Amino acid sequence: MTVHIHPTALVSKKAQISEDVTIGPYCIVEDDVAIGEGTKLEAFVHVRDCVRIGKNCRLFEHSVVGGLPQDFDFKGENSWAVLEDCVTLRENVTVHRASGEDKKTVIRKGSFLMEGVHVAHNVVVGPNCVIANKVGLAG
C-alpha cells in the first residue's frame, strides 16, 4: 500500500497521511491534518488546519473541511472538524471547525452528505445519516 498524491496537489509535510490514501489534482491539505487509511480526496478538495478524517472516507470535488466558524464569538481558539470512518462528502460540501476551546464539529461514522451541504460550527451529525442536497445545518 502506498500514498498517491497528484503532482498538482499541495500537501503540507506536517500533515499525517496514512497508507492507501489518494489525494487528487489541485487538492490542498494544510499542516494540522490527519487523514485515515483508504481515504480518497477527489480534485480541488481543501482540508484546512485542525481537521481529523477517519478511514475509508471519500471527499468529492470542491469540498472544504475545517473552515473557520462563522461565529462572532470565535476568537481563534483551538477547535476541530472531525469526519469519522466511512464518511462521504459529495461535491461542494463545507464543514466548519467548532467555536470554543477544544470543541468539535463532528460527522459520525457512515454518514453521506449530498452536494452543497453546509455543516456549521459545533454541529454533530449522527452515525449513518443521509443529508440531501443544499441543506444547511446551523451552529
Question: What do these predicted ranges mean?
Answer:
Residues H4-G139:
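Structural signal for interior beta-strand "rungs" in well-ordered beta-sheet cores
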